[in-house]
């Protein structure tokens, strides 16, 4: 996949080795004899389902945890990190999802926190600025060192974190889900920087659930399962998406999508000549009872905009909707919910969950109005029972229903949002990127829930930018491009080529065809 920029000297003296690493917590063996090697001049992915042990291993590498067994080597030297300071001092940097920067301090102050240049007991602001500019050069030239970190975008903060690591002489750099909240442009920039780190001979570890990123930037991948080492693939050019998924979950890729053919029912939702914000041409289609209808398109195709119209978040300027044979006018999301059209939004952290509320509160919040007449006592009993019912039915992994939802994994947060809608009368479910940022095991569970809903007669419409996903779970696929419906493809006829031909703007599609 990528040329390895490494020498024999690098390979002998700078490799990162995990030798039989184990970590036990009371009653839990988080890691069990992990052994593998990551080389300089490589981007080495760590993959596995949630709970596989990836984050625990990074915490050991970063000095936050002390291993219960085994040893860590960098080059020929055995490391015994007892703190994060030990790890940093040995040239290791771990870039976590939650960045360790102080928002109220400037970029320059964050870069040199703990060793600020000083003269006569006072911070030398001139020297600090010059040193900060040197750190940011070629990495984030547009960032003013005097800007407070809290005013930067998430992508810019990440660049500051990387600059900070490099300023401390890091030669082993680990990224933990670095793109989970970045825009497409920020992801491209990060990929270029990681490629540069590889070319400079750094050891780069990369933890991600996103297959496309792993195949795009990584030279090798090691798979974990249930805290154990499974396998290392050293040649990405010989590895397929399906092989990697099967290795991670122990099942064939088609078993993960769990497709079940079913007879198509009557029309549940009829969309006739719909126009509104973000749509360039009138859109018409039918969605049937018991059907999973896929919506595919590239960024800017109008998929999310269509969902906003169908869920009452935006008002249509033309066209009409029918729900099970009756005309439907949507003036607000409340109208859609009352009619039984429910939306799981794309950005679950901003639009789906209430982070500081409990799992139970997140599940019950939309159904409270329907049970307001019960009185406090009876409503409390119903809410407790409903939350426990949904947690059990959807296999939401949480210590208890009162746990704040922000502490759950992305997959379990998504299942809790689905539990919210399962608590209410539903006719049509709109799922916008339902498995984005979720590990492959949780994806399989989400797919199972989707199929169960369709089997119960619900019309499920799924927006996904993942071609494999939309082909794997859908009965039919509608393709949008630049705010217009370009075509419909049956499950039997769908393949990557014909879906992309429809999804690409005409001039780009012609170029692909030629």
UniProtKB/Swiss-Prot annotation:
<keyword id="KW-0547">Nucleotide-binding</keyword>
<dbReference type="InterPro" id="IPR050107">
    <property type="entry name" value="ABC_carbohydrate_import_ATPase"/>
</dbReference>
<feature type="domain" description="ABC transporter 1">
    <location>
        <begin position="16"/>
        <end position="251"/>
    </location>
</feature>
<keyword id="KW-0067">ATP-binding</keyword>
<feature type="domain" description="ABC transporter 2">
    <location>
        <begin position="251"/>
        <end position="507"/>
    </location>
</feature>
<protein>
    <recommendedName>
        <fullName>Arabinose import ATP-binding protein AraG</fullName>
        <ecNumber>7.5.2.12</ecNumber>
    </recommendedName>
</protein>
<dbReference type="GO" id="GO:0005886">
    <property type="term" value="C:plasma membrane"/>
</dbReference>
<dbReference type="InterPro" id="IPR003439">
    <property type="entry name" value="ABC_transporter-like_ATP-bd"/>
</dbReference>
<dbReference type="InterPro" id="IPR017871">
    <property type="entry name" value="ABC_transporter-like_CS"/>
</dbReference>
<comment type="function">
    <text>Part of the ABC transporter complex AraFGH involved in arabinose import. Responsible for energy coupling to the transport system.</text>
</comment>
<dbReference type="Pfam" id="PF00005">
    <property type="entry name" value="ABC_tran"/>
</dbReference>
<comment type="similarity">
    <text>Belongs to the ABC transporter superfamily. Arabinose importer (TC 3.A.1.2.2) family.</text>
</comment>
<keyword id="KW-1278">Translocase</keyword>
<dbReference type="GO" id="GO:0005524">
    <property type="term" value="F:ATP binding"/>
</dbReference>
<keyword id="KW-0997">Cell inner membrane</keyword>
<keyword id="KW-1003">Cell membrane</keyword>
<keyword id="KW-0762">Sugar transport</keyword>
<dbReference type="InterPro" id="IPR003593">
    <property type="entry name" value="AAA+_ATPase"/>
</dbReference>
<keyword id="KW-0677">Repeat</keyword>
<keyword id="KW-0472">Membrane</keyword>
<keyword id="KW-0813">Transport</keyword>
<feature type="binding site">
    <location>
        <begin position="48"/>
        <end position="55"/>
    </location>
    <ligand>
        <name>ATP</name>
    </ligand>
</feature>
<dbReference type="GO" id="GO:0015612">
    <property type="term" value="F:ABC-type L-arabinose transporter activity"/>
</dbReference>
<dbReference type="GO" id="GO:0016887">
    <property type="term" value="F:ATP hydrolysis activity"/>
</dbReference>
<comment type="subunit">
    <text>The complex is composed of two ATP-binding proteins (AraG), two transmembrane proteins (AraH) and a solute-binding protein (AraF).</text>
</comment>
<dbReference type="InterPro" id="IPR027417">
    <property type="entry name" value="P-loop_NTPase"/>
</dbReference>
